Amino acid sequence: MEVKDMIELSSKQNCTGCSACANICPRGCIRMTADEEGFLYPKVNEEMCMDCGLCENVCPMLHKPQQHELLAVYGAKNNDDAVRFTSSSGGMFTLFAEEILQQGGVVVGAALDEQLAVQHVLVDSIADLPKLRGSKYVQSKIGKIYSEVRQILRAGRKVLFSGTPCQIAGLKKYLVKPSENLLTVDVVCHGVPSPKVYHKHLQELAQEAGEPVVQVKFRDKAKGWKQGETLFFTEHQRFGASKRQETYMRLFLNNISIRPSCGECAFNNKRSLADITIADYWGIDKQYPEFDDDKGVTLVLVNSEAGAELLAQVKDKAELLTTDFAKGAEYNVAVSKSLPLNPKRAFFFEHLDEYTLKEMVERCLE
């Protein structure tokens, strides 16, 4: 059986791993397979392939979907402080998700499974919504979730799909035709770290503790929103530090462990394809200090009329502040541009299997 390493859709440098090609293939001959860095790329069984061209047609890097025009920008806080405390920023995603669930729809987003891997899942009850809440700084596995979303839309139910901008692009290209029952929320994305690096970190912490890691909190707010910590728990021990000091997060935030395509994101700077974009509203303590209580504020970019309608449906459960794109991007660089890959990135992945992540931090960042 002949298997080609990668479909020549976009170049490997540009491939986001969105998985639209694997979902659309009518013969199931495309598999998303991890490369030596741990990122998923498409592989095709050429003996099964009938050259239908569908995979090329749905590649969002070859054929970009139509973009929205930015309509409005807000700072926003969920009125429920308990929800806000367990959210990464201001808890607005939960309000959007609850609204769709109350309308009889389903919500799709990234969740941690029993092995602490990150993958996209469907949620159809408010009780299960917490698993989607909060940032997960690992590229999530899409699997066949686009296919499941299409089936639900065809059944006439609403779907709120959340993910990175490239995942939203992949979904929309896969669906081909727009659906009034589909609402999309993307997150302003610094880049997606390698699952291989993430699991290496979990394994090294487990070795140090003598027991497995059982819980991960990427953005714990016990010390406040701005001083948030990244924490890893075993049954008896806790590991972690502020997000700028923790080993795994340092590699991520310094653009060492992220996917190659993230160095030149095609979907930031008002190029989102989602109805709503959400992010941390960093710097609001300087711009609007009266609005900041260090419990978290969401930057909300409304990109479509459907997004505006969804925000209107939840506005009575939130506190909103009108702002603009320039202010929202002033202290959150990822809103408006990508940061280049770290010059030490190639060295990092070349020697990843030889050293611990702590040793790699010393070699690459100190």
At which residue positions do the language-model features occur?
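Iron-sulfur cluster-binding cysteine motifs and their immediate structural context
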Residues: 20-37, 41-43, 53-70, 275-276
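Long, compositionally biased charged/polar accessory segments in the mid-to-C-terminal portions
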Residues: 103-106, 211-366
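Short, flexible loop segments at boundaries between secondary-structure elements
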Residues: 183-204, 331, 335
